[in-house]
Amino acid sequence: AIFSDTKNCLEYLYVGDYGKEANIKADFLGLTKEINGVIHKKVDLEDKMVVTISTQKGCPMKCKFCDCPKVGFHGNADISDLRAEVMSAIVRSGCQHTKRFNLHLARMGEPSFNWNNIKIYLLCYLKDDVSVFMDADVIHPVFTTMLPRTLGSKTLKRIITEFCQVKNYEFRGEAGLQLSINSTDEYQRNDLFRGRSLS
């Protein structure tokens, strides 16, 4: 289910699984060929719940494959916004127990532009916010970045290193890092990201 908080310019969702048939980005890129031999099975929320939240109110990256440019950019989500998105998604799901709770920092916004708030949220609030409303055997945050050129490689390296420390020490290895590449062709990648991502 997708939720829009128009007052705070935020959007978030929860799903059990979001298979290829719902992959808008793959369709945009023309990746419509069905993969035979891979059986898609719907995942029950009690087995795996995926909550995807906005880390910014809109996004300054303006990628060609995304609808965020239509929203505009209205700043970073603050810690109370991050908390409200997660707790609201859990409550609205009605799920009280899950074996695996994945939090994807990937709905609207580029998380590296809001790293300070995200780091505080992951270190100080996420586990408590989940445990108030559900019993989760594993809590697994996922940091997805487009590697924005404006931050520079030194700052991006620091942010990724700090996230890996949060992963290793706060979540005992239970966290993921995703690099949003979208194409291995450098020209196509630069076009899709409008030259705003490191190659």
How would you name each of these model-derived features?
Residues 12, 53, 177-179:
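Short beta-strand motif preference
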Residues 90-199:
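Conserved AdoMet/S-adenosylmethionine-binding subsite of the radical SAM
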